[in-house]
Every structure is written in structure tokens, then in C-alpha cells.
Amino acid sequence: MIVLGIETSCDETSVALVEDNTVIANLVYSQIQIHKKFGGVVPEIAAREHLKRLPILFSELISQTNINIERIDGIAVTKGPGLIGALLVGVSFAKGLALRYKKPLVGINHIIGHVYSNYLAYPDLKPPYIVLMVSGGHTLILKVEENNNVTILGRSVDDAVGEAFDKIARLLGLGYPGGPEIDKISKNGNPNAFNFPKPKMYDPDYNFSFSGLKTAVLYEIKRLTKSGYSENNLPIPDLAASAQEVMIDVLLHKVTKAARDNNLKNIVLAGGVAANSRLREKIRALSEEFNFYIPPLEYCSDNAAMIARAGLERIKSGENDGLNFEPVPNFFEMMST
């Protein structure tokens, strides 16, 4: 079975063809360079770029794979959560194709799509397992049960971890997006140089809070400046490495606690922050107790291959949302549908 995936939830335009667990092609157009000068994603610009790029990318996909759309068994498109304008572009395009070529169409939860990115690398992966979802928009701990029911065990009560990376990077004068910049510069820093607080780390629940860490970094920069450092000679690698270490320690403490409390050994990572090299390094130290599933780097960020793979399950079982669904930008509304 071949499924076409379409992803336009934020600032990546992506289309893919997936046959079972094999990615035939996965094309991604990133808008990072466009949004970089604004220090973050501008929703209206993102939607306009999707509108411009999606038809071009789709034509390239068909041309490169030499697979006629008549051979495609179904279409999967990101339904939400995400930016409403961006989502509308993808959903409208998918509906047009489904109507024109009489193909089944399913709307996919973007969060679940990230989970399914692991199935592209680990086709034998099966529930139950715990998910650590770490991205610019969401930080979640999920429990996926054998019947594929998903329960939210924990979430960030303020900033998502990817958002915290961006904000701390801005404080340190680094570029956008902040996660890769902090990851890179931290390799030259001491992760124990600064004793930043670890918010909610030892609370009994599985929730996260990262806004206080951003404030702690800001106060440390002010303290260093008052003590004689100029803005040009601040110990940026040490500050970045120390802040990154706190975020990773909190993430791993919470997700392993959730796994132990639920008597589960399998932990699945998902989302853009799963590409962080320090996170991957520290996971290796836990590999004797837990089985970690980490998506390949190319499937950590938003992509249509993961959407196609998630849709394949539903289309194979005969599901078809048809044309009677709309994008759902809100996370909690999306998780309840």
C-alpha cells in the first residue's frame, strides 16, 4: 500500500510517499531562513510560503518517483495541532487531490505523526510504550497502550522545551532556531559550570516547567555583567551547556519515572529536540534499564513521511475521513478528537 503524506503544520512544507515501512521519497522545504530574521515563525508568512511551495513540491515528488497518483492508495494530511493558516493550506490541497482522484483521505494528529516516525526505523515497534515528545511547540509524556489508546501523563505547564531553547539562545546572542545553536556551542562548554535550578524535577507528577530556567539564565548573565564581564566575553559555551544539561536531566528524569511507575521498558522519543546530541548521549547511559527508540535525524523535525506512515494504519483498516473535517490548531482539542 502506498500513501501520500502532506505536512504543513508550522514552517516546513513536506510531501512524501511511503509504502508500508519504506519511505519511497520524502521532500521537505524549510522556511527557517525566511523566519530567522524575525527570531521566530511568523504565521502569515508561513501560510503564504506553504501556498507557494506545496504544489511545486508535490510535482517534484511525482516526477522524482515516477509514481502516477493513480497508483497511490490513499492520502494522509496533518490536521493539527499547528498554525491554522498553515494547516488550512495542507488540508485544502489534500482535499482537492482526494476529490479529483477519488482517494481515501485521513486527517492525522501531528503529535501522533511524530510518534510514528519511529516506525520508519523500527518496524517491529509495538505498544505499550512511553513517549517523550519534545519539540518547539510541545513537551509531553504519553502512554501508548496495546489498543493504541493514548493517555497524556505529563506536559509542560509553560514553555515547551524547544521554546525554552529558542528563548535561552536569544539571551545568549545565538541564532534561530535555538536548539541546534545551543547543541553546537555546548560541545565547547562545561555543563556543570553553572548551577541552574531544575524546575519540577522532583515533583511527584510528570509535568515540566522551563520558563524559570530562562529567567535564571537571564539573572546569571546580569550577575556576570555586574561582576566585570562585558557582553562580548561572557562564557557563552558554559552558559549554554549548563542550561542544556538542566533541560535534558529534567526530561530524562521525568520520562524514566513515568516508565518505572507504569512498569514499562520501552521509551519512544519524538519531535525536533530528539535530534539533540547531548540528549542522545545521555540516553546511552540508561540503555541497560530501558529500551530507547530514537528516530533518525531526518525524521526528528516535521516531515510528511511520518504523517504518511501514521495514515497508512488507518487507510489500511478502511478508514476515510472524506472531505468533512477541518484543521484543529489547538492541542487539547486535537488530542480529544
Swiss-Prot record:
Domain of life, source organism: Bacteria
Cofactor: record remark: Binds 1 Fe(2+) ion per subunit.
Cofactor(s) annotated in UniProt: Fe(2+)
Coiled-coil segments on the chain, per record: none
Functional note: Required for the formation of a threonylcarbamoyl group on adenosine at position 37 (t(6)A37) in tRNAs that read codons beginning with adenine. Is involved in the transfer of the threonylcarbamoyl moiety of threonylcarbamoyl-AMP (TC-AMP) to the N6 group of A37, together with TsaE and TsaB. TsaD likely plays a direct catalytic role in this reaction.
HAMAP family, per the entry: TsaD (MF_01445)
The protein, known as: tRNA N6-adenosine threonylcarbamoyltransferase
Origin species: Fervidobacterium nodosum (strain ATCC 35602 / DSM 5306 / Rt17-B1)
Gene from which this protein is expressed: tsaD
